[in-house]
Design a protein with these regions (language model features):
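Condensing-enzyme catalytic core mediating Claisen C-C bond formation in acyl metabolism
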Residues: 1, 98-174, 178, 182-185
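Conserved catalytic cysteine-centered active-site region
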Residues: 1, 28-82, 121
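Phosphate/pyrophosphate-binding loops at sites that engage ATP/ADP/AMP, CoA/4′-phosphopantetheine
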Residues: 6-22, 183-190
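Buried hydrophobic positions in well-ordered alpha/beta secondary-structure cores of metabolic enzymes
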Residues: 10, 21-24, 42, 66, ...
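Structural motif
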Residues: 22-23, 80-83, 110-112, 125-126
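Short beta-strand segments
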Residues: 27, 57, 82-88, 106, ...
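Short, well-ordered, mixed-charge alpha-helical segments that flank or form enzyme active sites
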Residues: 32-35, 62-65, 90-95, 136-139
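Flexible, glycine-rich active-site loops centered on histidine and acidic residues
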Residues: 75-109
């Protein structure tokens, strides 16, 4: 529901109706259900036309991944506009006893409409630069151990609180700062 409200607000702010959107991309790691996608739920709730609608799971960087993907889809001519939404409901996967982690996460959503500038020169730059990195070697630094197909939620996993978010905060912070610094340097070099 947060994603729907964010999408409505973005469309209203842009002065367009959801029916004129060419694509809907939702970044979330806390979908209401495994499927259909949250983007399809948003599409239906907004009354949007049957257009490209899909989810992206990239956690904290998901919104940036979404905007970058929207830019690529527009530049390739696939779409003229893309509603990009990032929505998370982390409160349901937080262990209140883990104060170091629980205080860092919450629930929220934001959205932006990325559009092709009609009057722009064909070589207009659009988004000037993006550098996105993922580091799979840090897989265990922030995780929800149970709930996927590898380890479905069951009595034992619930007793062990394995359906709750776990994070090694200091290690995540160090990695994020290092990657953010490198991304900024790389973008500025362009």
């Amino acid at each position: 529901d947060l994603a729907v409200v964010a999408g409505q607000c973005a469309c209203e702010a842009a002065g367009i109706t959801p029916q004129s959107v060419d694509a809907i991309l939702v970044s979330t790691t806390s979908p209401d259900s495994a499927f259909p996608s949250t983007a399809c739920h948003v599409q239906r709730a907004l009354g949007a036309n049957p257009v490209m609608a899909f989810d992206l799971s990239a956690s904290c960087s998901g919104f940036l991944y979404g905007v970058s993907m929207a830019d690529v889809m527009i530049r390739s001519g696939q779409v003229r506009s893309c509603l990009v939404i990032a929505a998370e409901v982390k409160s349901r996967s937080l262990d209140a006893r883990d104060r170091e982690t629980a205080m860092l996460f919450g629930d929220g959503a934001g959205a932006v409409l990325v559009v092709q500038e009609v009057s722009a020169h064909p070589d207009a730059p659009g988004i000037l630069g993006v550098r996105l990195y993922a580091d799979g070697s840090g897989h265990g630094l922030i995780t929800i151990p149970a709930g996927g197909s590898r380890k479905p939620v069951g009595v034992d996993t619930v007793r062990a609180s394995e359906h709750m978010l776990r994070m090694q905060g200091r290690a995540v912070f160090r990695s994020a700062v290092r990657r953010l610094e490198q991304a900024m340097i790389d973008v500025l070099k362009e």
